[in-house]
Amino acid sequence: MREGTGEPSNYWALNEFVIERSGSAGLISIRVMADGIHLNDYWADGLIISTPTGSTAYSMSVGGPIVAPGADVVILTPLAPHSLTVRPIVLPSSTVIEAQVIRDDQPYVLAYDGRSRSFERGGEPIRFRFSRASHVVNLVKLPEQHYFQTLRSKLMWGVLRHG
């Protein structure tokens, strides 16, 4: 959900939300609260908030963990953070995550499962609240295929290559 001085807006995603800078110059600063407690101020190109389903997409490509689909968690993965000590973190899916761009001299984008919304620099302060939806998505699971088999075949996970 996006909150500013106007009406709150709701966005839904199965894989991930990404708050990232728009354009090529500068970093953005994102303050993150977890259940109302200050978690971190990320000084980075952006931040990925992903589900286990989304963990093998953008989050994995920037160093986030692979998370099995049945895990009841949410993953926060910074995009090119300015500090070497900032790492991805895995939180319970019941955690309400609030994020706000606190240094808004750069335009930024909220992307969610291939869609996006742009925000200009110096606009109204906007707080994004991420929480688990009350509804469930049922996915087809083929009995002859297991998640680990898919990881090995599609991502070449754990495959040794000798030259």
Set out the residue ranges of the language-model regions.
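Catalytic phosphate-donor-binding core of small-molecule kinases
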Residues: 1-47, 56-163
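Oxyanion-binding "anion nests"
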Residues: 53
